[in-house]
Amino acid sequence: MKKGFSLPLWVAGAARSALKKLVGLPFDNYELIKIPNEKKEIKIEIHSVGLLKDDSHALGISFAKSGLYLDITQNLEIWTIASLERNSFNNPLQTNPINIIAGSGVGIKEDTSEICISDFAKEVLYENLLDIIPEGFNLKLEIIFPNGVFLAERTSNKSFGIVDGLSIIGTSAETYSSASPDQLEEAKTNLAKLVQNDFKGKVVFVIGENGLNLAKNCNLKFPILKVGNWIGPLIVDAAIKKVKTVILFGYHGKLIKLAGGIFHTHNHLADGRIEILVYLAVQEKVPTEIIVQLSHLKNLEEALLLLERFDKSIAEKLFLNLSNTIEKRSFTYVNRYVKTDMEIASIIFDRKREIRWAGTYGNKYISDFQ
């Protein structure tokens, strides 16, 4: 499979090139980007760089190459505008030498208006820019994705309270397809490492960057494994490795697929989310006219809002049933391949990243996530 590099590296490459131009260093058609806490550098191609506004600003441009055909950021055009600001006389040792600003097409958090950028992305920027900033100055770095607003409409960003563009996420330098067998093998290798030495028998499986970031913020006492879309085979692998408890932690829009017996959750392979919700609504004896409305909705968040407007108690009961169904269907799935009494727990969060529901087993651990 063709390898690529995550969005933070391409942003850092464009930013480093712009800053070098601003301080008078020569242009190169690539930048060697250092990876935090790793002894390696990655060559990032730079498209162009130039000075703006009477040479007080510099623009660096790169095009992301994630190596993933279906990835939304493949060939994404990235602009970074660098400018320098003198340290304040009253505060010569400012604690934030780099001010990262969300320009057009870059996602911000709806509730705080802060730029949506991962800790890894910030670390990559700091690692590769601090050594070029002249003494006595701070760097103002505006990041722009010219096509970001349009592309964001094809993501679930709004479901997580991210608006106005694409978020700058990523927790590692290299990328791989979430539907690729390579990802499954890497996740199985990581699971094998987790269950060694002082492993206590319980592990948290998360899907996607939002789930991973939220789980890390919970300061869990359990190890966390990002499983991508190969969740079914990895639950089976956990049973083979004699794991005692797997806690499935994720957004309802992904985990609902398990309730319908879909154990590879990539949307390009199978969807069925609304259909599964309609089935659960029938079980809860939701009126026919509401079920018809549900069947025509585009996503699960719209369905949840419709159900809550109709009857909050029924909506809550339905999603609790969803949590229990996820646990039961997952246990049945695993036992097709390996006989096990491994406990499978489900804990689900909503678009506001609030932990809302848990199954029978998930309730035993939900306090650890709050």
UniProtKB/Swiss-Prot annotation:
Its EC number is 2.1.1.195. The keyword S-adenosyl-L-methionine applies. Transmembrane segments: none annotated. It catalyses: Co-precorrin-5B + S-adenosyl-L-methionine = Co-precorrin-6A + S-adenosyl-L-homocysteine. It holds the Pfam family CbiD. It is an enzyme of class 2 (transferase). This is Cobalt-precorrin-5B C(1)-methyltransferase. The lineage of its organism: Bacteria, Bacillati, Cyanobacteriota, Cyanophyceae, Synechococcales. The gene is cbiD.
